[in-house]
């Protein structure tokens, strides 16, 4: 596995052979409803922005005009700017002894008969976001913590436990406009996952960090908690579970807690490869959700209006560029991008 890819020129993806992880659908934008026309064009080309990684995750656009993303097995955060990918941070996830004991095993989604197939422990960081001051927030996954990167580069651990019990693997993370940080904790940061003897919190949970205090918002209600996103008005929190392939919507109370969770849209009937993982929302409230067949675009009313199918199964995504109209898609070994009509939020 290469932990530092050779930067490649951006190329448009046309008809190509898909990986085993890709959808049965062809690469492109697929319309299910005319509402898609005002969101993204079916003629929008999907481009390769960078490639040669192990398992990319957590894309986030920074105010400095560049994209950051993680390569989990490489334990690296990369910076993508002007078509070039470079190392931004080493040891972004687990950064201690006995590294071989950490990180659940995964692979790069090639078929096992393919000579490019690789298995590896997921020792690096996972989700990334920015706080209201523009500082990088990291769900360190195998590092079992939420970390903030200060302006001088110092790492500040904001949270690594709940009531004295260590997290198992913070997965994805978002920031509310009041500065509070919402994140999911999973078993994926540990080698044996839920059966690992180092598990201290025997459930997947949704937490909120605010001014140094960690509050448990949800546990056991939804298995395999993973991706999350707020609606533009922050009245709702959307939440999915990895492998569960459905999304719930929760009302956000004035105090920041959540209530009245309901099924918002269900992807379980679709048998194409792909799972619910990363999620983003645009300024009109449309939800972009990874799932079977690619990235599902769902209206604020819960209607599936179209799917973006990149060459590889998408894991997470982010809006970027100056106008926030480029959707960056993190897959196993590459970062793809496509232009959309509505800016991200």
Report each predicted region and the residues it spans.
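Bacterial N-terminal signal peptides
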Residues: 10-21
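Sequence-structural signature of mature extracellular/luminal beta-sheet repeat domains
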Residues: 25-345
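Bacterial N-terminal signal peptides that target proteins for export
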Residues: 2-11
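Intrinsic low-complexity/disordered segments
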Residues: 1-2, 22
């Amino acid at each position: 596995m290469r932990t530092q890819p050779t930067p490649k020129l951006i190329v448009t993806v046309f008809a190509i052979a898909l990986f085993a992880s890709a959808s049965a659908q062809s690469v492109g934008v697929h319309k299910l409803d005319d509402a898609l026309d005002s969101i993204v064009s079916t003629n929008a080309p999907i481009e390769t922005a960078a490639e040669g990684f192990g398992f990319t995750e957590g894309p986030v656009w920074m105010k400095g005009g560049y994209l950051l993303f993680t390569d989990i097995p490489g334990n690296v955060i990369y910076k993508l700017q002007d078509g070039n990918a470079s190392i931004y941070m080493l040891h972004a996830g687990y950064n201690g002894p006995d590294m071989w004991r950490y990180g659940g095993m995964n692979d790069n989604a090639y078929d096992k008969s393919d000579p490019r197939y690789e298995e590896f422990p997921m020792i690096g960081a996972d989700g990334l976001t920015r706080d209201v001051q523009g500082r990088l927030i990291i769900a360190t996954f195998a590092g079992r913590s939420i970390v903030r990167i200060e302006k001088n580069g110092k790492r500040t651990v904001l949270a690594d436990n709940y009531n004295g019990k260590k997290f198992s693997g913070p997965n994805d993370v978002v920031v509310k406009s009041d500065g509070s940080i919402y994140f999911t904790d999973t078993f994926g940061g540990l080698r044996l996952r839920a059966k690992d003897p180092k598990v201290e919190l025997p459930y997947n949970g949704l937490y909120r960090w605010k001014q140094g205090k960690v509050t448990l918002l949800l546990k056991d209600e939804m298995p395999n908690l993973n991706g999350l996103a707020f609606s533009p008005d922050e009245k709702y929190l959307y939440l999915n579970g990895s492998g569960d392939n459905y999304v719930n919507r929760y009302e956000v109370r004035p105090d920041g807690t959540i209530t009245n969770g309901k099924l918002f849209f269900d992807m379980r009937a679709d048998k194409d490869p792909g799972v619910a993982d990363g999620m983003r929302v645009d300024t009109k409230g449309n939800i972009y959700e990874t799932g079977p067949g690619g990235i599902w675009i769902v209206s604020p009313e819960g209607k599936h209006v179209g799917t973006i199918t990149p060459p590889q199964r998408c894991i997470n995504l982010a809006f970027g560029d100056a106008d926030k109209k480029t959707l960056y898609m993190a897959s196993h070994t590459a970062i793809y991008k496509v232009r959309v009509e509505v800016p991200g939020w």
